[in-house]
Every structure is written in structure tokens, then in C-alpha cells.
């Protein structure tokens, strides 16, 4: 059976691993998943990630906890295959009063909503994290 929304699967795996208090989570890798993991690491939501280039590429994400609680309180898919969400730079959402981030796929790469606003580019809102 083919996977329809691989990013939603990634976010679900992260949520489930954090609820089970796992240290790491492994999943099939893709360029988009690696780009999203890179943004999560830059923003301090995960400790690290490794993308292996085997016959079947695997992405391993090391989760981050603070005083025993997961750093990522909520990670949810915004744009999905059935309903894509494209926003202009000035229409990008602020998440949780600016405490969270929206990850946006732009013509200049995958970045946070703040970086996209600063660069003056819009794009597809992939997910929100706080």
C-alpha cells in the first residue's frame, strides 16, 4: 500500500514517539522530510537528525525533552494533499502568539514563517509547531 501523505506520517511518528517518551524515532527519508527536520533542529524543537543514504533511505530524529516533558507540545499538518494552503508573505500565520512556528515551503527553500516574512516570500504552509 502506498503512503499518500508522508509528511503527516512523519508528524504522527514524532507525536507518538514523544508520548511514549522515546529518545529517537526512525522513518523513511525524503528531501522534504530532511528539510523539515533541519528547520525543527534550527528552532530547537529536536536535538538532532541523521539521514542515511542506504538502499532504503532512513531519517532518524533525536527528540528533545525539557524537565521530562516533550519540547514539541503540538505538531500538526496545515497544508495537505486534498487541500493545499498557499499564503503570501504578509498572510503567513503566527502560531501561538509567536511562541510557535509555521514551516513554509517557499521558492527559496523550506523555512519558518518568520524567515519567510523577513525574506518577503510566501509559499505552502506545511505545518505548525509549538
Swiss-Prot record:
One of its GO terms (cellular component) is ribonucleoprotein complex. GO terms for biological process: translation. Keywords: Ribonucleoprotein, Ribosomal protein, RNA-binding, rRNA-binding. It holds the Pfam family Ribosomal_S8. One of its GO terms (molecular function) is rRNA binding. PANTHER family: 40S RIBOSOMAL PROTEIN S15A (PTHR11758). One of the primary rRNA binding proteins, it binds directly to 16S rRNA central domain where it helps coordinate assembly of the platform of the 30S subunit. NCBIfam families: PRK00136.1 (NF001109). Belongs to the universal ribosomal protein uS8 family. Part of the 30S ribosomal subunit. Contacts proteins S5 and S12. This is Small ribosomal subunit protein uS8. It comes from Hahella chejuensis (strain KCTC 2396). The gene is rpsH.
